């Protein structure tokens, strides 16, 4: 991983392939667009992968494959990194704000790509429409607890509201019992 755990251990299957799209990808400033793709695919890209990469890059508005990465805008860098993680198969795809710097047509293209993806998708995003269209299970980490919802984002919102209302109802019931106990003790135990 990118971070060393404070404690415990990280256990990963030996053949598990994980691809990660950072929010702010970094590249070697002297590499060209195609060299950057080569460097990010975990092996030397074959001809078919390069053809696919060029098609994806073109679809995302990057057509000068010999352009140096230092000349790319932030949005172009994000799109280059996106192509680099999508070009080769993986088991787990971790995406940090994948729709940043994408217009609606590009976001639709990415949506279709991710809907066809058969691995696990872990995503951080503020794009609720996109989240609703590409997810079928949501795992929420809230106050140190993990909650799992076999729902799209819209269903998750409903189920989360129900869970939170149940917690509030339990707390109201607990408070009511405590008030009765305090009243009973105040009157004196008999």
Predicted regions and their residues:
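ABC ATP-binding cassette signature C-motif
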Residues: 1-172
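Short cytosolic helices in intracellular loops of multi-pass membrane proteins
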Residues: 172-188
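Conserved short loop/turn motifs at secondary-structure junctions
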Residues: 70-71, 188-190
């Amino acid at each position: 991983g990118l971070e060393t755990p404070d404690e415990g251990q990280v256990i990963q299957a030996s053949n598990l392939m994980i691809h990660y799209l950072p929010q702010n990808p970094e590249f070697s400033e002297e590499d060209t667009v195609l060299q950057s793709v080569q460097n990010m695919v975990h092996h030397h890209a074959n001809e078919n992968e390069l053809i696919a990469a060029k098609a994806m890059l073109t679809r995302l508005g990057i057509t000068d494959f010999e352009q140096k990465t230092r000349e790319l805008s932030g949005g172009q860098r994000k799109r280059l990194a996106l192509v680099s993680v999508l070009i080769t198969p993986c088991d787990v795809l971790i995406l940090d704000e994948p729709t940043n710097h994408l217009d609606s047509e590009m976001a639709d293209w990415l949506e279709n790509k991710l809907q066809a993806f058969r691995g696990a998708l872990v995503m951080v995003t503020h794009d609720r429409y996109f989240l609703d269209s590409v997810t079928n299970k949501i795992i929420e980490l809230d106050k140190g607890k993990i909650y799992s919802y076999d729902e799209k984002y819209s269903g998750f919102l409903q189920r989360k509201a129900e869970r939170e209302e149940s917690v509030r109802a339990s707390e109201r019931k607990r408070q009511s019992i405590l008030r009765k106990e305090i009243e009973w003790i105040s009157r004196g135990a008999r």
